[in-house]
């Protein structure tokens, strides 16, 4: 007689989730390595190798530095009145005018870079009793000697150099940047030949500040045929303030002012070529996509960029826990549910059903539970990007030699920030991965409990993610369970009858075992009784003597 469980009167329904033979390892709060079918890389580790000129306005400095363009070096005249979002300085940039230094070079460079413009307004300074527009063979403009176009070199007129005292008020409603300088002759003879006085002095003042510079006469290494130097200084005049210039020699005077603007413009040293393309994020290595929350291409960035971290890779789980299917089982040789392993080949959903009934076997995804999980996971990457992407640029830090301790401190602070963000990135991704796996496990359990509530007493939980259904359940019946329209009352009587038959047969088939165990117990008892009787009989006849000593 066939068991009712083995004919067409029952069916098996299993619930499971998607799996693949080889998943991806991710990190969670509770596990350093846990396998998931799908994961998204969060660290951008390569650049395009070129700087995109859209949406940011890129100004290629070519063979000019920003300061040379600011001063008006003859070979940088093309940059007059230019504007930019990002000024790109090249490693092959050079100066081609009178040798100079800027005592506060980094601050001036940063100030002008952030202003984003070289817009220059000429003003009518009156320099009485001196010769203007001095030039040098070190600064050729065409075949003739020249000088920085934004500066005015003042020398003696005849045999006199009077004391100069010039004022220039700021009657506008914006800040004005004035660039001026002091000439340091190489010899005392050069000093008197140019300025008469043996020692000059330059004082530039506003209501808020004052700078007094005394020339330092002496020979220096020859540069472009000159052993003298010019020191470049700068002064910002606020609206309503007044610029006052006082000098008795060695003054490199301003010709006007640069209009200061506030903005998010910047400067970057890079040799990457500039190309016609679109990218929000720029590094010295080239533009990089900003569709990831982290990058380890370069610490220096401009635009909306991923946060720099030390890690080469951080993977965000976008799927559930991966438990590869046991290949020895066969597809339906003995189907099992999610408690034992996942299912391979289920490509149209994350969660689904497998069944075995009178019509054969089948598999289908549960789109509702799959969509519920995807809806919660979707946007996770965007949320991480929003939390981490820089909305400002990370500028280069430059310090002069005398600011070495400040530079060391700045480097320590930057390194500490990177360490903290690298740690934060690890924790953030681990938390998100933990949440994703817990979420997908929860959706699987919800689907299982929903199915269990539908079937009620018509089926039995087999403990492996499957149900044994105690009534005939064709494909239409299985579909009703999947879509939630199953009516357990329709199959209640059939299920109850089949359950009793199956349990009854299982009980009868187990009688042999009970009889064997009872027979064995009785045989052991009788053997013990016979052995005890023999010992007592032998003791009475004297064949066995038992001595008890106290």
From Swiss-Prot:
Q: Which GO terms describe its cellular component?
A: host cell plasma membrane; membrane; viral envelope; virion membrane
- Note whether Iron-sulfur occurs among the keywords: no
Instruction: Indicate the principal place this protein occupies in or around the cell.
Output: virion
Q: Which residues lie on this side of the membrane: Cytoplasmic?
A: 536-550
Q: Which domain of life is it from?
A: Viruses
Listed transmembrane segments? 515-535
Q: Where is the lipid attached (S-palmitoyl cysteine)?
A: 539, 546, 549
The cysteines joined by S-S bonds are: 14-466, 52-277, 64-76, 97-139, 281-305, 473-477
- Site positions (Cleavage) are 329-330
Q: Which biological process annotations from GO are given for this protein?
A: clathrin-dependent endocytosis of virus by host cell; fusion of virus membrane with host endosome membrane; fusion of virus membrane with host plasma membrane; virion attachment to host cell
Q: How is it modified after translation?
A: Palmitoylated.
- Give the sugar-modified residues: 8, 22, 38, 165, 285, 483
The molecular function terms in GO held by this entry are:
host cell surface receptor binding
Q: Which InterPro entries match?
A: Capsid_hemagglutn (IPR008980), Hemagglutn_HA1_a/b_dom_sf (IPR013828), Hemagglutn_influenz_A (IPR000149), Hemagglutn_influenz_A/B (IPR001364)
User: Cellular location of this protein?
Assistant: Virion membrane; Host apical cell membrane
Q: Cite the record's note on assembly.
A: Homotrimer of disulfide-linked HA1-HA2.
Task: List other remarks.
Answer: Major glycoprotein, comprises over 80% of the envelope proteins present in virus particle. The extent of infection into host organism is determined by HA. Influenza viruses bud from the apical surface of polarized epithelial cells (e.g. bronchial epithelial cells) into lumen of lungs and are therefore usually pneumotropic. The reason is that HA is cleaved by tryptase clara which is restricted to lungs. However, HAs of H5 and H7 pantropic avian viruses subtypes can be cleaved by furin and subtilisin-type enzymes, allowing the virus to grow in other organs than lungs.
Q: What does this gene product do? A: Binds to sialic acid-containing receptors on the cell surface, bringing about the attachment of the virus particle to the cell. This attachment induces virion internalization either through clathrin-dependent endocytosis or through clathrin- and caveolin-independent pathway. Plays a major role in the determination of host range restriction and virulence. Class I viral fusion protein. Responsible for penetration of the virus into the cell cytoplasm by mediating the fusion of the membrane of the endocytosed virus particle with the endosomal membrane.
| Family of this protein | Belongs to the influenza viruses hemagglutinin family.
Q: In its UniProt entry, what is this protein called?
A: Hemagglutinin
């Amino acid at each position: 007689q066939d068991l009712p469980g083995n004919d067409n009167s029952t069916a098996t329904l299993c619930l499971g989730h998607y799996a693949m033979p080889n998943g991806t390892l991710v990190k969670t709060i509770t596990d350093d390595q846990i396998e998931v079918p799908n994961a998204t890389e969060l660290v951008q580790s390569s650049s395009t190798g070129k700087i995109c000129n859209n949406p940011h306005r890129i100004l290629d400095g070519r063979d000019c530095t920003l300061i040379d363009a600011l001063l008006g070096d003859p070979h940088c005249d093309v940059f007059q009145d230019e504007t930019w979002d990002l000024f790109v300085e090249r490693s092959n940039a050079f100066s081609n005018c009178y040798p100079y230094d800027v005592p506060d070079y980094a601050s001036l460079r940063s100030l002008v870079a952030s202003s984003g413009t070289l817009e220059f307004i000429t003003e009518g300074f009156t320099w009485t009793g001196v010769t203007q527009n001095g030039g040098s063979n070190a600064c050729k403009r065409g075949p003739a000697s020249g000088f920085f176009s934004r500066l005015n070199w003042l020398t003696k007129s005849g045999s006199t150099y009077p004391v100069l005292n010039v004022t220039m008020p700021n009657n506008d409603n914006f800040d004005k940047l004035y660039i001026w300088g002091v000439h340091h002759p190489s010899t005392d003879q050069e000093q008197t030949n140019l300025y008469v006085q043996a020692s000059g002095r330059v004082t530039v003042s506003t209501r808020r500040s004052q700078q007094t510079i005394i020339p330092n006469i002496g020979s220096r290494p020859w540069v472009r045929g000159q052993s003298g130097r010019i020191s470049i200084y700068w002064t910002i005049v606020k609206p309503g303030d007044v610029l006052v210039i006082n000098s008795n020699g060695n003054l490199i005077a301003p010709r006007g002012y640069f209009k200061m603007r506030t903005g998010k413009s910047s400067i970057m040293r890079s040799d990457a070529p500039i190309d016609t393309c679109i990218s929000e994020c720029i590094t010295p290595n080239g533009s990089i996509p900003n569709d990831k929350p982290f990058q380890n291409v370069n610490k220096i960035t401009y635009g909306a960029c991923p946060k720099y971290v030390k890690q080469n890779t951080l993977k965000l789980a976008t799927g559930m826990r991966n438990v590869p299917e046991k290949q020895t089982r066969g597809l339906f040789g003995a189907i099992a549910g999610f408690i034992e392993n996942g299912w391979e080949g289920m490509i149209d959903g994350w969660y689904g059903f497998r069944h075995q009934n009178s019509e054969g076997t089948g598999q289908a995804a549960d789109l509702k539970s799959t969509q519920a999980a995807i809806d919660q996971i979707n946007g996770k990457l965007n949320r991480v990007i929003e939390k981490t992407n820089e909305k400002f640029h990370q500028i280069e830090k430059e310090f002069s030699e005398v600011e070495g301790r400040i530079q060391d401190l700045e480097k320590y602070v930057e390194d500490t920030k990177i360490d903290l963000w690298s740690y934060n990135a690890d924790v953030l991704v681990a938390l998100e991965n933990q949440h994703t796996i817990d979420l997908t496990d929860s959706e699987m359990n919800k689907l299982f409990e929903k199915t269990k509530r539908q079937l009620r007493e018509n089926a039995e939980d087999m403990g492996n993610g499957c149900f044994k259904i105690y009534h005939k359940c064709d494909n239409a019946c299985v579909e009703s369970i999947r879509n939630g329209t199953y009516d357990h009352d329709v199959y209640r009587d059939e299920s109850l009858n089949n359950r009793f038959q199956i349990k009854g047969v299982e009980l009868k088939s187990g009688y042999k075992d009970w009889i064997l165990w009872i027979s064995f117990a009785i045989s052991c008892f009788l053997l013990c009784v016979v052995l005890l009787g023999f010992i007592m009989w032998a003791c009475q006849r004297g064949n066995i003597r038992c001595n008890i000593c106290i």
